[in-house]
Amino acid sequence: MLPPVRAESPAVRGDPRSPDTPFIIERLQGWHLPLLDDPAFLPLHPLLQRTLLLSVPRGLASALGRRQSMGALVLVARESMTARRPTILGLMVARPLNRRGSTWDVEHLRLALAAAELPASPARSHIASSLLREAIHQVPGAVSWIASASSLDHNRLALLRENGFQPQRTERLWRWSIGDGDPLPCLSVPLQLRPLQRRNAPLLWHLEQATCPAPLRQVLDRRIDDLLERSGGHGWLLIDPDRNEAVAGARWIADHPGGGHQVELSVHPGWNHLLGPATELLLRRLAPKGDQLWLLSDTNDEARQQWLAQLGAEEHGLSLIHI
């Protein structure tokens, strides 16, 4: 068992002259950005810049006593003692999945590719574990943490297992490139296509309750405002006007480091026959032509996987959801 990481604000520091403290963990600051030039970190630069910009208004709101949703937690691990330009050894981005901060997601956990070549560099597993445990330590109000890992990433799987995470769900990752010349499919009557707004957001919430597995639904503990905030105003619903019920929906979740957007597609269990032109229309409304959408499908949902394959989406491996 690794020794606990001691937290101080804004950094986790030991005696810099001690060989037992080869690196410091601290929250992301502006001066870190030029140091994050390792290939492992470059795809995250837009996200990191946006996080720093958003931290300013959140700080002002907090100073004025105004309640605001919690922002992302970004931690960096850097060399603690060096006579040269310090090297960033690792980076972690964690994000609350609801406004109350009861559930957090390990969105990114990356280690510098060049760090292994440095003399006396700490073990990569030690850096990763320290970042994860420090993030958990800095969010004492969190009840649950969620993390995903590729089924082929044995180091990440071992890291999660050693820190108490248990696999709960296996999903397949898909990437779909929206064709430039493909026309929008037609929508069958009597369903109505509506953009996601605060007025119809309760319909999305009821749809999520019907489609999300009960154990995961309890952990996520998402409310209407959580769904609206996470989508950033980018979402579409298919509504049955006779019942005033959303039978399918698609919304943004996050920008994907590989380009494009991660989206969530929900189809009511009683309306799986909509997998086809109707759900394709939802996805096409989310992004312009030529863009890329990233989706997850449960490995037990054969109908959805078959539809995505017919749509021309490419498989990008299996992802194991840990809680």
Label every model-predicted segment.
Residues 71-79, 87, 93-104, 108-116:
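Active-site-proximal cofactor/substrate-binding loop regions of enzyme domains
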Residues 101-121, 258-271:
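Conserved acetyl-CoA binding element of GNAT-fold acetyltransferases
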Residues 151-169, 299-317:
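Conserved active-site alpha-helix within GNAT-family acetyltransferase domains
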Residues 139-149, 288-298:
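Conserved GNAT acetyl-CoA-binding A-motif
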Residues 321-323:
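Conserved small/polar residues in nucleotide/adenosyl-binding loops
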Residues 104-106, 132-136, 172-175, 261-265:
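Short, structured motif recognition centered on aromatic/hydrophobic residues
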Residues 118-137, 162, 272-287:
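Conserved acetyl-CoA-binding loop-helix of GNAT-fold acetyltransferases
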